[in-house]
């Protein structure tokens, strides 16, 4: 996000600029040892003859004034001091795990027949347009389909048809103080990398804080998720939590039971939770994935366990870019849209898509992640990691 942050502890004062450098921060140093920093030049009347230095904060750079020592510390000196306090490089080399380096387990990924796939699509509310227009287009072209501007469909709260929970949220966009960025021209500062695991204490410099799983794309293939489910690495414990419930049970009780199950696995040491609705059948229905993720997010915040775990979603419900962006914004750190991927398989088998299955899935995932970056950039956000938990969508209201 665009920001110029000033800070002080009484002895030192400093400023830091965001990585994009889109928030101006200019400063003067005068011959009577004053430093004046502001977003604009000319906020104070200063005799030009007293100015000994004019400079600006550069993207991602810091400035520190030590009032005790009476000196200005530049970005390079400041970062070198703190970078050498602990062997951060060694900690990362020995603790950071790459998803691409995990072994593929000798297990089969579940597959569905054409009839089973159709039944699941009906259970998760897929429409003809979802499959033949949205999913097919993204798998074929590696990008979202182009459509005319404007939205003439009724908002979900006024629709006479059942709408997915995602439809009750609309995307926000940056205004005035937080300008959007151009994610295409400024691709150099965008990042889709996320880190999965226990968030360490920012105030404690410990090697355990580096025990994380690095994932380059939060939209996971079935193989990616299979690798995570079966990873055997010290410091990581994975637990699968079903987000389905018996059809005669109330949704409220199902959510309460979900919270109880999550509390139990956390007590047993789990720090990666995989919420899955693969158990959907004629007797079991799925908790709406956005409700499960956001409800669990708030529950973990209330119980002060949120930073202890990471949430990964394995769901058949998300298929549009807006669905994924909303899930990431409300608590999920990675998503496996298994039914969307399975729909691609059956499009190929039906000769509606002439492409290798794995290439088509990669193109679909690429289209989704580029769409998410586009949504994030409207809010001035350049990294997917920064998108997590910030609620860049808000509920629609019928007025």
Enumerate the language-model features and the residues they cover.
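Feature captures the catalytic cores and cofactor-binding loops of soluble hydro-lyases/lyases
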Residues: 25-35, 40-41, 46-50, 168, ...
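Conserved catalytic micro-motifs used in adenylation/nucleotidyl-transfer and phosphoryl/amide-
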Residues: 1-36
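Flexible loop/turn segments at secondary-structure boundaries
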Residues: 12-15, 22-25, 43-46, 64, ...
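Single conserved hydrophobic/aromatic residue that forms the stacking wall/gate
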Residues: 390-399
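Acidic, glycine-rich flexible loop/linker segments
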Residues: 33-36, 40-61, 66-86, 323-328, ...
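Glycine-rich phosphate/ribose-binding loops and adjacent secondary-structure elements
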Residues: 1-4, 15, 236-369, 375-378
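Flexible, glycine/charged-enriched surface loops at secondary-structure junctions
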Residues: 179-186, 269-275, 375-387
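Extended, highly charged accessory segments
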Residues: 16-18, 51, 71-244, 250-257, ...
């Amino acid at each position: 996000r665009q920001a110029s942050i000033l800070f002080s502890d009484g002895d030192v004062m400093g400023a830091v600029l965001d990585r994009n450098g889109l928030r101006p921060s200019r400063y003067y140093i005068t011959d009577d040892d004053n430093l004046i920093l502001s977003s604009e030049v000319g906020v104070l009347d200063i005799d030009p003859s007293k100015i000994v230095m004019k400079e600006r904060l550069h993207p991602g750079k810091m400035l520190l004034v030590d009032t005790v020592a009476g000196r200005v510390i530049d970005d390079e000196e400041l970062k070198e001091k703190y970078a050498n306090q602990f062997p951060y490089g060694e900690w990362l080399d020995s603790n950071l795990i790459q998803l691409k380096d995990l072994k593929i387990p000798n297990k089969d990924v579940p597959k569905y027949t054409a009839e089973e796939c159709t039944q699941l699509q009906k259970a998760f509310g897929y429409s003809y347009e979802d499959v033949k227009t949205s999913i097919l287009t993204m798998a074929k072209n590696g990008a979202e389909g182009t459509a005319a501007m404007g939205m003439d469909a009724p908002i979900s709260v006024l629709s006479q048809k059942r709408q997915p929970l995602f439809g009750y949220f609309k995307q926000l966009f940056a205004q005035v103080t937080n300008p959007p960025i151009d994610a295409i021209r400024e691709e150099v500062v965008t990042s889709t990398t996320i880190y999965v695991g226990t968030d360490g204490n920012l105030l404690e410099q410990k090697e355990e804080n580096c025990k994380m799983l690095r994932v380059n794309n939060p939209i996971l293939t079935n193989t990616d998720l299979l690798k995570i489910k079966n990873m055997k690495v010290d410091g990581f414990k994975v637990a699968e939590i079903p987000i389905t419930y018996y059809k005669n049970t109330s949704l409220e009780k199902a959510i309460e039971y979900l919270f109880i199950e999550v509390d139990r696995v956390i007590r047993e040491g789990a720090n990666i939770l995989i919420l899955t609705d693969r158990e959907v059948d004629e007797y079991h229905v799925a908790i709406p994935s956005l409700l499960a993720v956001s409800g669990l997010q708030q529950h973990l915040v209330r119980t002060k366990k949120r930073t202890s775990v990471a949430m990964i979603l394995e769901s058949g419900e998300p298929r549009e870019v807006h669905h994924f962006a909303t899930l990431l914004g409300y608590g999920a750190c990675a998503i496996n849209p298994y039914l969307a991927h399975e729909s691609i398989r059956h499009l190929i088998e039906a000769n509606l898509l002439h492409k290798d299955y794995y290439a088509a899935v990669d193109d679909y995932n690429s289209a989704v992640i580029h769409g998410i970056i586009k949504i994030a950039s409207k809010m001035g956000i350049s990294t997917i990691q920064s998108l997590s938990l910030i609620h860049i969508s808000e509920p629609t209201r019928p007025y």
